[in-house]
């Protein structure tokens, strides 16, 4: 049996969006669980997602007032999934923002931060960059579903992801929500 898990990040409601796009319900049709990798901004986002499936979430750099952990591990069908936003610490966040504003964006740095957060996991899910990404570091699947909220420099459009987990092995797919 294959278990479907919805993966979402960087919703930024109501900071950048008034509400979640309606395409999320269709994208997450049939999922048993939704993992939110932070920058939620409002608990009503988790309530709305919770009408689709149970939600596990972590705090992002824009979630100062939400009482959520910065990272956690979830086990689904024998697959250990590390969930983090990916900004590491406030000090690192501000240093990286400065670097980016000076034209030194480095996706590898954020992937390293996310993967260094966990030991002994099969999948690491992160957000923060607003850039969809799917790669392996050794045997560990690194997956960033991109962002739901509009972004000032990304042209991929809003995206979420779905993990298909069978016998402890996860496959990830990116799901565009349309503009």
What is each model feature region?
Residues 12-15, 75-120, 150-154:
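Active-site-proximal segments of metal-dependent phosphoesterases and phosphodiesterases across multiple
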Residues 1-53, 64-70, 155-157:
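N-terminal active-site segment of His-dependent metallophosphoesterases
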Residues 13-16, 40-45, 62-68, 89-93, ...:
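Active-site environment of divalent metal-dependent phosphoester hydrolases
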Residues 7-9, 33-39, 56-61, 83-85, ...:
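Active-site neighborhood of phospho(di)ester-bond hydrolases with catalytic His/Asp-centered motifs
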Residues 47-82, 115:
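Extended active-site neighborhood of metal-dependent phosphoesterases/phosphodiesterases
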Residues 1-6, 73-83, 136-142, 165-173:
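Beta-strand-turn-beta hairpins that frame and shape the catalytic cleft
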